[in-house]
Amino acid sequence: LIVATLIVAGLTLSQLHHQVERRVAATTQNLVRSVVQTFDGLIDSLDVALASAAAEIEHENALHPGDTAAIDATLRRRQSMLPIAVQFRATNAQGEIVYGDETPFPHVKNADREYFRMQRDNARQGLFVGKPIFARIASKWMWVFSRRVNHPDGAFAGIVFALVDIDGVVEDRDFFEP
């Protein structure tokens, strides 16, 4: 009788263990799907905001060349519409950051950055999602998203880019809430 009880208890524990493993696996898969959807949504939002900002910068530069206040306001509007803290900036064709909060940055050029080169060298690039970089101005790790800005004749005029603070996203619990 004792042996039978031990066998039944062992089988029951084994079944419970497998049930817990299946539930943990299902919960983990659901969480991963949720995080992927959240990041996909963020990337889509950034793409729309950057495309819109690039179009507005092109329009402003065509109508009012050198009007930094209007372009700075455009960038502030675009970044305020996003669900996380993002810094929007824009460069001229030489890679100098000339638009965005806290500009100008006279000694900071982004011409050597991959995201700048990709936009400069590829007129049809669209959204470029770069590898995380250590930002020179913010002095922290950032994820960079960029789009090309053109002159009215289609020539390269610079880029508009968004810097997403990686630590800020990880620490923002509200960002991951459904």
List each language-model region with its residue ranges.
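An N-terminal domain-start capping segment
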Residues: 1, 40, 44, 141-147
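Juxtamembrane extracytoplasmic/periplasmic/luminal helical "stalk" adjacent to the first N-terminal
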Residues: 3-65, 76-84
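Short alpha-helical linear motifs
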Residues: 52, 70, 92-95
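Short, glycine- and charge-enriched coil/turn segments that flank and shape catalytic ligand pockets
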Residues: 62-66, 151-154
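Polar/charged, Q/E/K-enriched amphipathic alpha-helical segments with strong coiled-coil propensity
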Residues: 64-65, 70, 170
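Structural motif corresponding to alpha-helix initiation and N-cap regions
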Residues: 68-73, 112-113
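Extracytoplasmic/periplasmic ligand-binding sensor regions of membrane-associated signaling proteins
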Residues: 79-87, 93-176
